[in-house]
């Protein structure tokens, strides 16, 4: 193995950082960190028509949010076009490539003939050994690799095992287009070589590219990096991942209230396993990750499992960390921008105090924020249908009777307030629920909330009593 492990994540900025790309980045990052190496980031932006600055920003932001920090500066493939062109010309000079003057019409005829014969379309090599003085006038040539025609190309893939292609089935691929721009196949090989990449970890939809890229490496006399083609992600039903399954941008998961550490943990378990262990800290992932435990079968994305895992992380998270996460994630959450002005230091302190009860009932930050809605609500509270039903005349009478008892409370603590209510229940003979539920409705506007005495304490004496007086009969 080389002295230093160097991996790379190389997305195309033609859209968001989707969940499959995020997992590929995670695997590259973990592999590099495990070996004490580096993960580089290359933006493959040679498709100028489809590449956008917004997509680049989304990729960088998504990786940063997930905590997958790359090493060194971002490398932009388009800025290296001159280098790619020089390499193509060097292959030409070495007799490893040639000018091809086949016209679009000729190429279409080759494709049509292949269709008729029921075989994959491939270039027939007609310009492979022809002299340049045969070139038709007015036709700009492409440069094609002079690929081996006999024998086999074999890849010892670290996930897929040994994969072999017959060279007769691999045609002479284009390296440089007629306008002088490099093809993806050439650019990837040159960039990986120049960046010192030692391990290529990518989706198995790139497996067919591997044979062609290996032939370019061999023509250049360069060593081929170790390759690992990881299985794609499918939906829970086994079908190819689509938006309904979860093929969304990483930013969408942030907006749905998932914690980055929970999403990292869920993604690492999609295709990689370490016994029956489900939950991994980042340090444990780095320590345990290897390619030997990556399976070959497509992993299945299951929203329910992700949600349950996120709930686990919420319940076990430090309360202050969750307040900070809510604060920074607020602009991305539904109605978060509306709440932002209310997210004062006083509200944050209340949120911190309420967090033990809130996080037990939530699986996402969206649910956590929804549960904390009572802290941001303004008087008079808007009551939902269930809360209105709870606040009948009898319930309002109980609230009216409790207000002076609460006013006389020597301290505004949950335990003291609970003692007052229990004494009232014992004296009047009503059931605790007949009092606690109307209190909840009056204080939160809902029929569900954290423990009602905790709610009273968190709201504080003045706000708590004011809300009760609003609903007292």
Curated annotation (Swiss-Prot):
E.C. numbers: 6.1.1.17
EC category: ligase
Gene Ontology CC terms: cytosol
Keyword Metal-binding (UniProt): no
Binding residues for ATP: 243
PROSITE patterns given in the database record: AA_TRNA_LIGASE_I
Cellular compartment(s): Cytoplasm
A GO term, aspect molecular function: glutamate-tRNA ligase activity
UniProt entry keywords in alphabetical sequence: Aminoacyl-tRNA synthetase, ATP-binding, Cytoplasm, Ligase, Nucleotide-binding, Protein biosynthesis
Segments of this protein annotated with the region Disordered: 111-132
Claim: Ligase is one of the keywords in the record: yes
Pfam families per record: Anticodon_2, tRNA-synt_1c
Motif window: 'HIGH' region: 11-21
SUPFAM superfamilies registered for this protein in UniProt: An anticodon-binding domain of class I aminoacyl-tRNA synthetases (SSF48163), Nucleotidylyl transferase (SSF52374)
UniProt-listed GO biological process terms: glutamyl-tRNA aminoacylation
Subunit structure: Monomer.
Reported function: Catalyzes the attachment of glutamate to tRNA(Glu) in a two-step reaction: glutamate is first activated by ATP to form Glu-AMP and then transferred to the acceptor end of tRNA(Glu).
Protein name as annotated: Glutamate--tRNA ligase 1
Organism: Beijerinckia indica subsp. indica (strain ATCC 9039 / DSM 1715 / NCIMB 8712)
